[in-house]
Amino acid sequence: MMFCKLLRCQNGIASKRAALSLKGFKTSSINLVEKKLNKYSETITGPKSQGASQAMLYATGLNEEDMKKPQVGIASCWYEGNPCNMHLLDLGRRVKEGVKKAGLTGFQFNTIGVSDGISMGTTGMRYSLQSREIIADSIETVMQGQWYDANVSIPGCDKNMPGCLIAMGRFNRPSIMVYGGSIRAGHSPCQNNAPIDIVSAFQSYGEFITGKIDEPTRHDIIRHACPGGGACGGMYTANTMASCAEAMGMTLPGSSSYLAGSPEKFAECEAAGSAIKRLLVDDIKPRDIMTRSAFENAMVLTMTLGGSTNSVLHLIAIAKSVGITLTLDDFQAVSNRTPFIADMKPSGKYVMEDLFAIGGIPSVLKYLHAEGLIDGSNITVTGKTLAENLRGFKDLAEGQKIIRPLSNPIKTEGHLRVLRGSLAPEGSVAKITGKEGLNFTGKARVFDAENDFIAALERGEFKKGEKTVVIIRFEGPKGGPGMPEMLKPSSAIMGAGLGKDVALLTDGRFSGGSHGFLIGHVDPEAQVGGPIALVQDGDVIEINAVKNTLDLMVDEKEMARRRSVWKAPPLKYQQGTLLKYARNVSTASKGAVTDSLE
């Protein structure tokens, strides 16, 4: 096999692992004539009545033989202005070459994208979650409108992965996701070449305004945090969702761990051609792979790794695309029985580059399967079960310090907690690793915009020893709109050394890079008159991550008085894409989807 030869010429254990993981996809012996694999594209390539369609395809360079081949849509979330995405066009070309070698016809197309890291802390972040829906809509539109028989999608940044998987669930034709890969760690010359990443850049501002670092050090950090292409390196949203996709069986083994620009990633791209051909032959579709058991596996992996709160929104939305209902209670049930064992950023020390060196996500899955935490019987895009795929991988490296044994976890239960109570009757999602404690009671400081909080922090209005619950509201699906991520405020709190003194609560979201005492996705949101809209400065708020409660300690009589005089503010946008989004988006607890009939 060509891709195995490519890997064999590379040095090192990682390349050998990749060769082992990708073997078994050789399908050149399959006779496409024996089994019709172009059952969708034949709608336009077959009938004489579709002569105009065929004329346009000939114009693209197809010949008579090509017209009989299955057509594969190769979707890339490529754009130049983001390290997570800037290399994806090249990966798409490599996938197309693999598709061609497998005897199929590949057509590349693109989606839009929004960089969370670049838009963070600005109104541009309102477009981030919405981009998930546009990505899903665009891939679905091209696949259905062009009658492609199969799909390979290549995502990079946070919302790309769920957008691709939602689309695959909707059109339900043989599909594979090829993750763009993680960035390598940066190093700060001003700090003895200490490893740094994008969250280091975010936290540098809080460190600077509190005098912990000087301006040359701050600039050094932001200059060296991101050394090249690839998604943010910690167990943030991109790596969380790529790992979830692999756990569900929608990627080739190892995809979520292979670094951007690595020989393993290039080999995976070529192998996708043979793999998609096998899926066509066996007629294995996304809804055959993304079963309830597969989603359970993804939730378990997320809890063990300390993954992003965004996984809750995204997995609920992906499940909906394949006709499965996931709820907040499903996540809490998994969290109750799943230990948190990964010492990975943002709450820990290591990044995906380090995890890859000890075996990557396949070795983690192999360990969890051996311990009975995940179901290995689920079918995957290899045509084999998850357990069969994992046999080709080594156990976690002996003596490694990144993944703890289940007998000695960082936390005996998962870090994601679903909290309900008088402040969040329909639920909220907390990211609590235990380092910041399990309970928090403090007085509310209420802000209707995140930059108002940043200004208050700059003025020194928050002190150590004063327990404060900062509320940033009107940032929900409709009110934001788009549930902007609060990485700028959470990073500023941690950078200022206030992680144990200030809890942050919002109807918006948190980046996968956030850490601290954080509660997001508060439902109902402020825009629709949820209790969070009625909170006033000085109100006492009690957070209990053991009992999973979130309560506003204000009596019902006073709440009724506040409710009687409250009026909903107008939507922030009166035209354009965000108005359409605000009018159609569901609640956070339902995944913030825009194609619901409810």
From Swiss-Prot:
Its EC number is 4.2.1.9. The active site is at residue 511. Keywords: 2Fe-2S, Amino-acid biosynthesis, Branched-chain amino acid biosynthesis, Iron, Iron-sulfur, Lyase, Magnesium, Metal-binding, Mitochondrion, Transit peptide. InterPro entries: DHAD_IlvD/Edd (IPR050165), Dihydro-acid_dehy_C (IPR042096), DihydroxyA_deHydtase (IPR004404), DiOHA_6PGluconate_deHydtase_CS (IPR020558), ILV_EDD_C (IPR056740), ILV_EDD_N (IPR000581), IlvD/EDD_N (IPR037237). Its cofactor is [2Fe-2S] cluster; Mg(2+). The keyword Iron applies. It holds the Pfam family ILV_EDD_C. Dihydroxyacid dehydratase that catalyzes the third step in the common pathway leading to biosynthesis of branched-chain amino acids. Catalyzes the dehydration of (2R,3R)-2,3-dihydroxy-3-methylpentanoate (2,3-dihydroxy-3-methylvalerate) into 2-oxo-3-methylpentanoate (2-oxo-3-methylvalerate) and of (2R)-2,3-dihydroxy-3-methylbutanoate (2,3-dihydroxyisovalerate) into 2-oxo-3-methylbutanoate (2-oxoisovalerate), the penultimate precursor to L-isoleucine and L-valine, respectively. This is Dihydroxy-acid dehydratase, mitochondrial. It comes from Schizosaccharomyces pombe (strain 972 / ATCC 24843).
